[in-house]
C-alpha cells in the first residue's frame, strides 16, 4: 500500500531549519515564503524548491495551494527578551498573519513556533488569548508548551513556544517526548578543522577583550566578563542560545585548548577567579586560543547537517543560523505531528 503524503505550507521559512525537520519527518512542502532575499537563496540552494520571496501580506492567501499542515515561526522580535518586548511592534502582528493563512486554507493541523516569552509572560496574555479565541472560532483545538531544544537532540539550550492546533480534536494533540540525552558542545565542535580551512568556514575576527566593569555570576560562563554581548561556551554542556546578532562582538567564543584537551588549564576559570577577588581584569590580554565560533560551528550547534549551505555575506549567514529553528528540534516536533495524522487516518479507515 502506497504511503500517504501529507502536504505542508511553510511560512516565515528563513534558511529552512524548520522545513528541514518537517521534511525529514515525511511532510512535503508545497509552498514556502520568507521576506529575506539571502535566506531565500539559502533555501533554494539546499532544497531545490522555489520559495516565494517577499512580505507574506503581499500574497493572496486564498490562492495558496491546499495543504494538510501549515507550519512556521513568525518573526519574534516584538516578543523577544533579546528585543524590546513590545506587543505593538509591527513584527508582533505577524502571528495573526500566520493565523489568517490557517483560516484561508483550513488545514487539519498547524504548528507555530515563537519565543518562550509569548507563552509565559503576563505582558503578552492579551495577544495569547486573542490568538486562542480566534482559533477556537475557526474550529481548532489548541495546545501550547514551552520546549527546550537541548532535550531534543540539539546541542543548544533554546527555549521556544510551540503552539499546535488541530481541527476539533484536542485529545489527539501530541508534543514530542524528550530524548533523554543532552549533547555537549564539545561533541559537535571537536570534528572541525582550523577556522578558514577544510570543513570550518566563516571565521569571525571580532576582537575579544576583558570588561572594565564585569558583571559577575557564580559561573564564568554567566554574567559578562568581556566587552560586547558574546559569551564563552561551556564545552561540556549544550551551548547557550545562539543569537541572530552574531557576526561581530556578539558572537560566542570557545577555548580551543580545552576543546583539544579537556584536562588543559582552564584560562577562563582563572580569569573569573581573579575578577571575583576584585582584581582589575580590563588590561588582561585574551590569549589566541580563545576565539569566536565560525559560521560552520554555529550551524552545527544549531543542529544543521554539515552539507547544508548558507548564502550571503558572513553576517547574513550568522543571522540566518541564529534565526533558525534547530532542524533536530523541528524533526521531533514534526514526528509527533505525523503520528497525529496517522492516528486520524487509522481511525478513518477502521
Model-derived segments and spans:
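Class I SAM-dependent methyltransferase "Motif I" SAM/SAH-binding loop
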Residues: 11-15
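Conserved SAM/SAH-binding beta-strand->alpha-helix loop
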Residues: 36
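Conserved SAM-binding strand-loop segment of SAM-dependent methyltransferases
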Residues: 48-55
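Short beta-strand element of Class I
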Residues: 28-30
Amino acid at each position: 500500500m502506497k504511503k500517504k503524503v501529507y502536504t505542508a505550507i511553510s511560512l516565515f521559512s528563513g534558511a529552512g531549519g524548520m522545513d528541514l525537520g518537517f521534511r525529514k519527518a515525511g511532510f512535503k512542502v508545497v509552498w514556502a515564503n520568507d521576506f529575506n532575499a539571502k535566506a531565500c537563496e539559502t533555501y533554494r540552494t539546499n532544497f531545490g524548491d522555489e520559495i516565494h520571496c517577499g512580505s507574506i501580506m503581499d500574497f493572496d492567501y486564498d490562492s495558496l495551494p491546499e495543504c494538510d499542515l501549515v507550519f512556521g515561526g513568525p518573526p519574534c522580535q516584538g516578543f523577544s527578551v533579546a528585543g524590546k518586548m513590545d506587543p505593538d511592534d509591527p513584527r508582533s502582528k505577524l502571528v495573526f498573519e500566520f493565523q489568517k493563512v490557517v483560516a484561508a486554507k483550513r488545514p487539519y493541523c498547524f504548528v507555530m513556533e515563537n519565543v518562550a516569552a509569548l507563552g509565559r509572560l503576563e505582558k503578552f496574555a492579551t495577544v495569547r488569548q486573542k490568538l486562542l479565541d480566534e482559533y477556537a472560532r475557526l474550529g481548532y483545538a489548541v495546545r501550547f508548551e514551552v520546549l527546550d531544544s537541548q532535550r531534543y537532540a540539539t546541542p543548544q539550550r533554546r527555549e521556544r513556544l510551540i503552539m499546535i492546533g488541530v481541527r476539533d480534536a484536542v485529545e489527539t494533540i501530541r508534543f514530542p517526548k524528550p530524548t533523554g540525552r543532552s549533547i555537549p558542545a564539545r561533541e559537535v565542535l571537536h570534528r572541525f578543522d582550523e577556522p578558514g580551512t577544510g570543513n570550518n568556514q566563516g571565521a569571525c575576527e571580532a576582537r575579544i577583550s576583558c570588561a572594565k566593569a564585569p558583571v559577575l555570576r557564580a559561573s564564568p560562563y554567566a554574567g559578562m566578563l568581556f566587552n560586547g554581548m558574546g559569551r564563552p561556551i561551556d564545552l561540556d554542556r549544550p551551548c547557550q542560545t545562539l543569537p541572530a546578532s552574531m557576526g561581530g562582538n556578539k558572537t560566542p567564543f570557545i577555548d580551543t585548548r580545552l576543546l583539544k584537551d579537556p584536562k588543559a588549564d582552564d584560562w577562563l576559570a582563572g580569569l573569573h577567579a581573579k575578577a571575583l577577588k576584585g582584581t582589575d581584569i580590563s588590561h588582561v590580554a585574551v590569549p589566541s586560543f580563545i576565539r569566536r565560533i565560525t559560521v560552520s560551528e554555529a550551524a552545527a550547534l544549531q543542529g544543521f547537517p554539515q552539507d547544508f549551505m548558507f548564502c550571503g555575506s558572513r553576517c547574513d549567514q550568522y543571522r540566518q543560523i541564529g534565526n533558525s529553528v534547530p532542524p533536530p528540534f523541528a524533526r521531533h516536533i514534526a514526528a509527533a505531528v505525523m503520528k497525529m495524522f496517522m492516528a486520524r487516518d487509522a481511525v478513518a479507515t477502521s
